[in-house]
Amino acid sequence: TGPNVVNPVAQLETMHSRAPEMRFFSTTSFEVKPVRGLTLKSDFTADLDVLETDAFQPVIDVPGGSTTTLREQEHTRTFHYLWETTATYAEVFGKHHISAMAGFTTDYKKLRLYDFRTQNYPSDTWDKYQNLWQNGSWYRDPTENYYEYAMVSFLARLGYSFDDRYFLTASIRRD
């Protein structure tokens, strides 16, 4: 009968896969100078990403082709935001320059992913509405991953210079 050689063209032509993705990304900034030397600034960035994958591989009736149907569905949802707010004061007195900054940052991210894989569907045709559980034997157990991360940081910086020749800076950050 000869060697079992895979036909990659047949595999590509019979595989059905869709992966629509929706993504929203936005950055908003606000800055105000209420009095001379003082600047208040806030930046907010949000990122939302939703990806849904649906793939189906039918039986491929060629040498080396797939002998069973395979279906995979995956859903991933990610939400991330970063918020930074600072107050900065700077003033010059003759040859003396002073500056001070204080603020906080908030960083948050949440991800949820789940997927299902089955094989041995009764039909060789792909139907996106076909029940993933219908008459298929489990290829592997469904999986779910959940990740959540949050961090708040407080920060401050003091600066001094004399005659633009001598500089002193101190900073601190607490997460």
Question: How would you describe each model-predicted region?
Answer:
Residues T1-A10, D54-L70, R112-P142:
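Surface-exposed loop/turn segments flanking beta-strands in extracellular/periplasmic regions
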Residues P8-D47, L51-A55, E72-V92, S99, ...:
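Outer-membrane beta-barrel transmembrane strands
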Residues T45-D47, V59, F104, Q119, ...:
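Flexible domain-boundary/linker segments
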Residues S99-T105:
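Extended hydrophobic secondary-structure segments that form protein cores and membrane-embedded regions
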Residues Y108:
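N-terminal active-site segment of His-dependent metallophosphoesterases
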